[in-house]
Amino acid sequence: MAKKSKIAKNEQRKVIVERYAAKRAELKKTLVDENASPEAREEARLGLQKLPRDASPIRVRNRDQIDGRPRGTFQRFGISRVRFRDMAHRGELPGIYKSSW
């Protein structure tokens, strides 16, 4: 299980990303726009740099929803491969069964 502080920090990052998402999208749109003046693009670049680091969605880590394991997570299920295997063997995941041939 991951440290509770790491899980809490990741949840805090998700909130910050959500808070600044609209502003980031607006600034990035200005940066990519070829019709925008160089001054406007420079201003957008500086505005993007002034946002908090944690406002970038790339800093959010995909973690296991149950124990917070940071690696080997299945996005479709939201759990780690280890947890997935255990739950599948116990029959807790409907429609998932061990293959044999």
Swiss-Prot record:
One GO BP annotation of this record: translation
Gene Ontology terms: cellular component: small ribosomal subunit
GO molecular function annotations of the record: rRNA binding; structural constituent of ribosome
Any single Pfam family the record assigns to this protein: Ribosomal_S14
UniProt keyword terms in alphabetical order: Ribonucleoprotein, Ribosomal protein, RNA-binding, rRNA-binding
Function per UniProt: Binds 16S rRNA, required for the assembly of 30S particles and may also be responsible for determining the conformation of the 16S rRNA at the A site.
Recorded family membership: Belongs to the universal ribosomal protein uS14 family.
UniProt subunit comment: Part of the 30S ribosomal subunit. Contacts proteins S3 and S10.
PANTHER family per the UniProt record, alphabetical: 30S RIBOSOMAL PROTEIN S14, SMALL RIBOSOMAL SUBUNIT PROTEIN US14A
Protein name: Small ribosomal subunit protein uS14
Source organism of this protein record: Kocuria rhizophila (strain ATCC 9341 / DSM 348 / NBRC 103217 / DC2201)
Gene name per UniProt: rpsN
